[in-house]
């Protein structure tokens, strides 16, 4: 009888694993992402993507680059929270504390939406150029991007745009799509 326990135990784990995989893959929502986006903020990321009309993969990648998903993150220049809002920008877009993850992601969505509208006056050639301009405006400020007529020559901003784009196409690819 003792020899049967490993077999029954293995069978039980196989069944549990199969049921877990089936239930995990049955929901195509953003909250069923396979671990790239912290589960507790997946719906917030999906909402920010909807508000901003940008892909959820991009919103998630931006949060990763901004704060590495640390709601208590604070930059040397005073940006705070998951989406790293400067106090002046938080006053315009945020509600409550910048360190509140849900509020930070919600504000990110609205700010990205407004940045998208601002950079549209530069008449981007395509969706990718528009997205790059939005990211550059988030990093360097919309005034700089508009005055430069595009992505400024700041290495930090150029790296920022490239890093988010790459992460959105690799680590976060498909995290909120029907195929994931």
Where does each model-flagged region fall?
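Non-catalytic cell-wall polysaccharide-engagement segments
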Residues: 1-44, 50-52, 88-106, 110, ...
């Amino acid at each position: 009888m003792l020899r049967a326990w490993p077999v029954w135990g293995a069978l039980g784990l196989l069944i549990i694993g199969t049921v877990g995989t089936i239930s995990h893959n049955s929901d195509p929502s953003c909250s069923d992402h396979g671990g790239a986006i912290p589960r507790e903020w997946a719906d917030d990321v999906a909402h920010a993507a909807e508000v901003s009309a940008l892909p959820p993969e991009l919103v998630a990648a931006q949060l990763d680059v901004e704060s590495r998903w640390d709601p208590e993150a604070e930059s040397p220049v005073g940006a705070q929270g998951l989406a790293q809002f400067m106090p002046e920008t938080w006053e315009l877009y945020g509600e409550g504390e910048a360190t509140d993850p849900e509020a930070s992601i919600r504000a990110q969505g609205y700010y990205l939406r407004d940045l998208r509208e601002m950079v549209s006056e530069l008449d981007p050639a395509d969706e990718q150029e528009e997205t790059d301009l939005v990211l550059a405006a988030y990093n360097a400020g919309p005034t700089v991007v508009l005055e430069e007529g595009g992505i400024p020559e700041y290495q930090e901003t150029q790296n920022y745009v490239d890093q988010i784009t790459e992460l959105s196409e690799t680590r976060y690819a498909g995290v909120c799509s029907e195929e994931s």
